[in-house]
From Swiss-Prot:
<feature type="modified residue" description="Phosphothreonine">
    <location>
        <position position="175"/>
    </location>
</feature>
<dbReference type="GO" id="GO:0005524">
    <property type="term" value="F:ATP binding"/>
</dbReference>
<dbReference type="InterPro" id="IPR015940">
    <property type="entry name" value="UBA"/>
</dbReference>
<keyword id="KW-0723">Serine/threonine-protein kinase</keyword>
<dbReference type="InterPro" id="IPR028375">
    <property type="entry name" value="KA1/Ssp2_C"/>
</dbReference>
<dbReference type="GO" id="GO:0004674">
    <property type="term" value="F:protein serine/threonine kinase activity"/>
</dbReference>
<keyword id="KW-0808">Transferase</keyword>
<dbReference type="Pfam" id="PF02149">
    <property type="entry name" value="KA1"/>
</dbReference>
<dbReference type="InterPro" id="IPR001772">
    <property type="entry name" value="KA1_dom"/>
</dbReference>
<comment type="subunit">
    <text>Subunit of a probable heterotrimeric complex consisting of an alpha catalytic subunit, and a beta (KINB) and a gamma (KING or SNF4) non-catalytic regulatory subunits.</text>
</comment>
<feature type="region of interest" description="PPI">
    <location>
        <begin position="387"/>
        <end position="494"/>
    </location>
</feature>
<feature type="region of interest" description="Regulatory domain (RD)">
    <location>
        <begin position="293"/>
        <end position="494"/>
    </location>
</feature>
<protein>
    <recommendedName>
        <fullName>SNF1-related protein kinase catalytic subunit alpha KIN12</fullName>
        <ecNumber>2.7.11.1</ecNumber>
    </recommendedName>
</protein>
<dbReference type="InterPro" id="IPR017441">
    <property type="entry name" value="Protein_kinase_ATP_BS"/>
</dbReference>
<dbReference type="GO" id="GO:0106310">
    <property type="term" value="F:protein serine kinase activity"/>
</dbReference>
<keyword id="KW-0547">Nucleotide-binding</keyword>
<dbReference type="InterPro" id="IPR000719">
    <property type="entry name" value="Prot_kinase_dom"/>
</dbReference>
Amino acid sequence: MDGSSEKTTNKLVSILPNYRIGKTLGHGSFAKVKLALHVATGHKVAIKILNRSKIKNMGIEIKVQREIKILRFLMHPHIIRQYEVIETPNDIYVVMEYVKSGELFDYIVEKGKLQEDEARHLFQQIISGVEYCHRNMIVHRDLKPENVLLDSQCNIKIVDFGLSNVMHDGHFLKTSCGSPNYAAPEVISGKPYGPDVDIWSCGVILYALLCGTLPFDDENIPNVFEKIKRGMYTLPNHLSHFARDLIPRMLMVDPTMRISITEIRQHPWFNNHLPLYLSIPPLDTIDQAKKIEEEIIQNVVNIGFDRNHVVDSLANRIQNEATVAYHLILDNRNQNSVPNDPFQSKFKEISDGIFNSTLPVQNITSHVGHSFSALYGLKSNVKDDKTWTLGLQSQGSPYDIMTEIFKALQNLKICWKKIGLYNIKCRWVRSFAYYKNHTIEDECAIILPTVIKFEIQLYKVREGKYLLDILRIDGPQFIFFDLCVAFLRELGVL
């Protein structure tokens, strides 16, 4: 080992004492990825080392920070896992799940077109991951085989959330980004767009899986754009009847006519041989964070951590050595428990009572008898309803709805200011005996001086039907979600 290499190794050891650094897995213009072993658990991880000065010079600071923030929020078996982020003045160290195999792109290049059963297996996992993102109001915006990895068991891991963005209900994205061959018509046309762009990209990926080629391809990029905007492509004769039905519905130029994820889940081609764990949507992120497994806690205690410290850290979503160990042990157990059906054991136990996006949205009655639909990031099954809604729908009168809202805010000690006829700004300080009185588990919170600011707007969707929208303005996102849960309970929705 020369002097420079020894110096680099010593630097990594001092910054990352909990990891044994191994070989370089890859490198790029502003980062390199190292294989490492988490010493306490013995599990392998990948550590992405990002150079701050190079990131700044390339003008991608926002992209990098966006990906870090989004991946911290996501927990899904088919989305790459981020365990911790360690920052120094010169570098950012992102500890991530280690995926052994490679890109889906290379797999397609090597094998050519796949048999429909194999393509379906991969596509089902991709849709599950994308659905989870959309449920959490995240649009990937750059889905392509290069951004989909395969693990050692040929299971999907969606990566590269640098171009992703967080959607707010009632708002559309306008930034034109993503890879030309996979970009939706509304993106390349510069029109406002929503999560339907990911459906289009998934359609292109499905075409590539089944055909071994891209539907929209040309040496000349303007020609590619023209084909995309006109929806010009050819379906090979070898495709089955149901595959020939599904692909055109995903590659619909008009996004309002494009098939939704709910409809994809109901499609005969998708449903064929659908694994149990994929037939049940995973817990929402807020519920996942609250779910603490005793068996894993004990494993973490066995390697030297204090039990109360582990539980408190998990309950308050604190990143530290204990929580990193917990999630590494949990994820590796889930991946290895059922080799041919990853995470089945985890999802099987929550199958009863879970809100399934493939089922009709259930009506729930509030205290005053108004009927609300819990639409947390899910599309309705109503055929003519093509909007992406986050909120509560009601058929009550606006006056009655606002009266119930004011009662709920008062009970939760939330201050508000009226800024429009059916529009209010709210402010809540976490300093009251909130968790104890409003059924959120006591262990999930330590009272801290946290301020949450949000806006409530009542929209008229159609005659006699109204949508209540809640938009976070400022404050920690997870705590805001907790507050929303308490608010919904006050309204009688949960």
